[in-house]
């Protein structure tokens, strides 16, 4: 495959959409992408990375459309939880574009695959640990960066569900 890519007049382009870089996790992803890009560029593979500046669906939709206009063969998306995003990505998939999603599993997208962890289970684990180290009745503040990312919603749901199960009498502050 490598030789075929090198001799091809049409290099394969892959688009990657990341959320803003204020998250250390995203910075690690970017570092890995840049390393892979250097490694595979000799084989005619072009990686186009676009970093969002907000967590607004309109911005992500614009980036998706920009990558389509650049004739990418496939896309890796850290998807926002928004019906317009679902619709656009599913349209691309229906038109034979390979799409994977990562970090935020979104039920409305029919991706090729998902790469990431079980955020619901992570939230349950955090609540279980909190229950072991804090006395009953503790007031808990929960901070999430955006309701537009299903990973944050899933983690919060797991956290709340586990606290309800253990009947810890914790109070989650708004």
What are the functions of these language-model segments?
Residues 1-10:
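N-terminal helix-turn-helix DNA-binding module of bacterial transcription factors
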Residues 13-32, 48-58, 80-82, 147-153:
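Extracytoplasmic "Venus flytrap"
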Residues 14-18, 33, 126-174:
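An alpha-beta-alpha
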Residues 16, 71-79, 98-102, 141-142, ...:
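Periplasmic-binding protein-like
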Residues 34-49, 164-170:
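Signal peptide-proximal N-terminal region
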Residues 45-71, 174:
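Structural motif
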Residues 67, 74-93, 159, 173:
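Hydrophobic alpha-helical
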Residues 82-121, 132, 139:
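Flexible loop/hinge segments that line or gate small-molecule binding clefts
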């Amino acid at each position: 495959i490598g030789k075929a890519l090198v001799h091809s007049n049409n290099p394969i382009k892959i688009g990657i959409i990341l959320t803003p870089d204020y998250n250390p996790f995203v910075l690690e992803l970017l570092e890995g992408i840049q390393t892979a890009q250097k490694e595979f560029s000799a084989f005619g593979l072009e990686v186009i990375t676009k970093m969002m500046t907000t967590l607004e669906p309109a911005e992500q939709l614009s980036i998706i459309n920009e990558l389509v206009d650049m004739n990418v063969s496939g896309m890796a998306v850290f998807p926002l939880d928004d019906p317009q995003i679902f619709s656009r990505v599913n349209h691309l998939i229906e038109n034979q574009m390979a799409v994977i999603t990562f970090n935020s599993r979104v039920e409305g997208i029919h991706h090729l695959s998902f790469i990431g962890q079980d955020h619901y289970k992570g939230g349950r684990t955090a609540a279980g640990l909190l229950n072991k180290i804090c006395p009953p009745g503790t007031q808990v503040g929960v901070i999430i960066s955006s309701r537009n990312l299903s990973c944050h919603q899933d983690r919060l749901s797991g956290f709340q569900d586990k606290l309800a199960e253990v009947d810890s009498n914790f109070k989650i502050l708004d």
